[in-house]
């Protein structure tokens, strides 16, 4: 399989927005914007790894059992099947980061949620 994303795909979520900047065989690049004080679900992916690069703002990243703090120009790598989430630690400024997904099957359906502030855990 490959990516099910195409350039220009976008969506709004309770925590902010995402937009596909580029995609190809086994990769996808997204720009993700997180509202002030918002947090994404604690989740993992069965088929993809992710690389996050902070472009603007400050973040707290849960990676497995660790809490990491990242600022502009810093990055984090999320291996396949690793629980993770990101929180915008600012009360006023949006957090923007670039997400690079790599794997054999890239699809929005590859999200296993464990905790979610917006009632999306199944």
Task: Show the residue positions of the predicted features.
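Glycine- and acidic-residue-biased ligand/ion/polar-headgroup-sensing regions
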Residues: 47-60, 64-65
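A generic "binding-loop/recognition-motif" signal
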Residues: 38, 47-48, 66, 82-83, ...
């Amino acid at each position: 399989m490959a990516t099910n994303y195409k350039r220009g795909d976008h969506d709004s979520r309770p925590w902010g927005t995402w937009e596909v900047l580029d995609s190809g065989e086994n990769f996808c690049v997204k720009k993700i914007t997180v509202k002030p004080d918002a947090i994404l679900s604690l989740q993992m992916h069965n088929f993809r790894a992710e690389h996050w690069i902070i472009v603007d703002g400050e973040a707290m990243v849960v990676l497995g059992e660790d809490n990491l703090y990242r600022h502009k120009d810093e990055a984090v790598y999320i291996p396949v099947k690793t629980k993770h989430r990101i929180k915008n630690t600012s009360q006023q400024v949006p957090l923007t980061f670039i997400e690079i997904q790599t794997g054999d099957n890239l699809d929005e359906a590859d999200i296993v949620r464990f905790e979610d502030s917006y009632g999306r855990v199944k």
